[in-house]
């Protein structure tokens, strides 16, 4: 038996299931290749934190990457971490906390906003959507923090771009193209992300104002002030009742 035949044998899956849960890169390749050959629409899912975002579509099968997770390599001194795409943001934060580091682009926690239960999703989901938090204007979007990746395109072919430092990228930067493509161009399998040290102290100032014009005026003043804020966000009053600020405390 050839090496390729052994690989196919070891990663062989039951494709009759509606939800496919690969635990290896080879299994992801096999699943996508099968769906491509059979012309089967495929939904890509991690922890389901962003399922309500975007346009709904009809899919016959779901590729669930929640079981394909784990830290591959973490180099605090080199300011990067390499993880599998199904790794939860929570797990990554716990690892970075050990060295007082962070994902500076602040992955959104939509779970906390809409039902009060934290669900930041997976790193693959965050980067597929290119979502970032209130620090975006200061540190850039999620795609600005991707150093490199491995992935699988719609035909089931492995692709790779970048590495673990910015200078690894020459020509077209596929990382920036695929980040924000909502899984339509490729499924991430491994991702190298830039990390940064945490600040010694952070403070959040909340100004409640029901008037849209006045609220935006306050925000512009704050962001342009000499205090050099690291982030900012404006919530219109008509949205406020839909959000649950379950971890907001005052002093």
Predicted region positions:
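Structural signature of FAD isoalloxazine-binding scaffolds in flavoprotein oxidoreductases
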Residues: 51-70, 84, 135-155, 187-190, ...
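Polybasic, low-complexity association/targeting segments
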Residues: 1-3, 56-64, 69, 119, ...
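N-terminal basic/disordered segments at the start of proteins
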Residues: 1-9, 31
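Glycine-rich N-terminal segment of FAD-binding domains in flavoprotein oxidoreductases
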Residues: 13-110
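Catalytic cores of large soluble enzymes that bind and process phosphate-bearing ligands
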Residues: 19-23, 80-84, 141, 166, ...
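C-terminal substrate-binding/cap subdomain adjacent to the FAD-binding core in PCMH-type
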Residues: 128, 147-251
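A generic, well-ordered mixed alpha/beta core segment in the N-terminal half of proteins
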Residues: 79-160
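Short, hydrophobic/aliphatic alpha-helical segments
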Residues: 27-40, 107-118, 157-178
């Amino acid at each position: 038996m050839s090496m390729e035949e052994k690989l196919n044998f070891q990663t062989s899956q039951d494709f009759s299931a509606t939800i496919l849960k690969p635990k290896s890169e080879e299994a992801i390749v096999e699943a996508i290749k099968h769906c491509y050959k059979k012309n089967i629409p495929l939904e890509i899912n991690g922890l389901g934190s962003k399922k309500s975002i975007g346009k709904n579509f009809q899919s016959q099968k779901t590729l669930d990457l929640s079981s394909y997770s784990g830290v591959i390599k973490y180099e605090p001194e080199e300011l990067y971490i390499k993880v599998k795409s199904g790794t939860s943001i929570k797990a990554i934060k716990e690892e970075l906390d050990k060295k007082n580091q962070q994902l500076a682009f602040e992955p959104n926690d939509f779970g906390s906003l809409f039902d009060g239960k934290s669900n930041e999703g997976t790193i693959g989901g965050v980067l597929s959507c290119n979502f970032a938090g209130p620090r975006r204007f200061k540190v850039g979007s999620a795609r600005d923090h991707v150093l490199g990746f491995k992935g699988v395109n719609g035909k089931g072919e492995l692709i790779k771009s970048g590495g673990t430092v910015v200078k690894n990228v020459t020509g077209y930067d596929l990382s920036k193209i695929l980040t924000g493509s909502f899984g339509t161009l490729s499924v991430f399998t491994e991702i190298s992300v830039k990390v940064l040290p945490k600040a010694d102290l952070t403070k959040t100032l909340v100004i409640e104002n029901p008037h849209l014009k006045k609220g935006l005026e306050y925000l512009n003043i704050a962001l342009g002030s000499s205090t050099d804020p690291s982030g900012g966000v404006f919530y219109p009053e008509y949205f406020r009742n839909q959000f649950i600020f379950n971890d907001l405390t005052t002093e």
